[in-house]
Amino acid sequence: MNDKYSTTEGKTSEKLSDEAMLSAQWKNIDWHKAEREVNRLQIRIVKATQQKDYNAVKRLQYLLTHSFYAKALAVKRVVTNDGRKTPGVDGVLWNTPAKKMKAVLSLTDKGYRARPLRRVYIEKKDKKKKRPLGIPTMYDRAMQALYALALEPVAETTADGKSFGFRKGRCAQDACEYLFNALSRKHISPKWVLEGDIKGCFDHISHDWLLANIPMDKNILKQFLKAGFIYQRELFPTEEGTPQGGIISPILANMTLDGIEKKLVERFHTNALGKVDLRFKNAHKVNFVRYADDFVVTAATPELALEAKELIREFLAERGLELSDEKTVVTNIDDGFDFLGWNFRKYNEKLIIKPSQKAVKAIVSNISDTILRRGKAWQQDVLIMKLNEQIRGWTNYHQSVCASDAFAHLDYVLYELLWRWAKRRHPKKNKWWISTRYWHRVGNRNWVFSTENKELIRVDSTAIVRHTKIKATANPFLDEAYFQKRKFDKGMHRLTGKFKMIWKNQNGLCYHCGMPMDVTEEREIFYLAPKAKTGVKDVRNMRYVHCACQRIYAENRLKK
């Protein structure tokens, strides 16, 4: 009897010891070194791709996907992103340092079999329809993240120059600037635009094409593609499309669509000798800009735009894709068109880019929902915090275009909605009581919706700052200094006051990991000493950190 108990206690003690050791290993990973080591291999993959040495590419990809540091970064990405608390079909979560370290050590291509995705349906923005979402297991997510590290250098090196979606260091504002350059010149710029819409791009890409053309381990890729999904306890196979909700899916989709720009250049910019000829380029005025599966083609005449449409249709057909005839239309620039949430239109030969009506309606709808439905019982400071998050996100996206009128309109809408919110909370109070309860004078501003600690952002105080477009040929793995400077400059333009000072003091680098931060991505303030000791507003005590790095830091402190 005693022997039985001692054996059980011994196993429990051994298990606890193993967990403690794994936990310590996870906490002691040097993430800065991990980034450096993986980046070194990625640079070698880029150079091998440029030299078209595909055997070297394959060999280096193998080294990277079997590297400890690459596996650690893959697991880190999975356990720090927004889906870290959502399990796949196996119900497994990596929510302790020991489980995370065990995952790093268990990632392998040997005998790998991807589990089916867990299918759920989520509401679309218009709330009338629901769209399907596939949730892979944590292990499959980590495998995708690992192989994405090896595939991304190839994708970046072979990508179209005017492709901006789901790519390192590129954004919608870059696409906007390239379109501005193509369309803004008086009497010279192209008059016609082909607005492209691909039917269910991510869902219909041919598996045969992907397996034949994507430079990565074919067995692993096949597992990603053929995993299937489970809905209401029934297994459904996947015969086409990229892994839904998968980390690697945007890279696969981009690589599928890369080549459209080259095809258009060959047809409209080259002479009989196959060389780019400025005479043809200037006569046809064909330009191509793509963001993920949305694209625009400019042309001198509607006939050229339709010819470009047929070339793109042929290109897509080889990949199992097709254009939507209803949504792929040729438009005159004087009538205007919408792209990436902006409206592009010429008024008396002057190009104006502003937030589209659809984008304005969407933010008004979201704010209305926050104030009148979700926030009807919130305290004022909670409501202010939630609204400021929405306002900052929207204004940061649109502040590089002619958005002053839209910003002023949003201020007016906010006032009307907040007055309804306040009136609903105090139906028996008069206007004077409500106004003095919720609106105050702050500095030289009257009627500020505020509390003692928080105040609502004034939307039209957002400065309009022209975005500096990226070099089309820039590679994030080879031109690291260029991309780091762009990130730093973007922060200096967008931040103000103490936040700008913190950013400048750190040179835009994360305090925890030392890697560059992007001002448009998630970040938070880390306090070196407790706020109670130094005060909330002491800049010397404040540092910017990646949210992911802060989660790991907080977790490690908690476990200690």
Stretch-by-stretch model annotation:
Residues 24-83, 149-165:
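Charged boundary/loop elements
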Residues 106, 110, 158-162, 167, ...:
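Conserved polymerase palm-domain catalytic core
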Residues 226, 232-235, 319-383, 389-392:
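A conserved non-catalytic segment of reverse transcriptases
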Residues 383-429, 436-438:
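Non-catalytic, peripheral interaction segments enriched in hydrophobic/basic residues
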Residues 413-495:
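Extended C-terminal regions of large enzymes
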Residues 498-507, 535-540:
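Short, flexible, mixed-charge glycine/proline-rich loop motifs
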Residues 514-547, 551-553, 558:
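Histidine-centered nuclease catalytic patch
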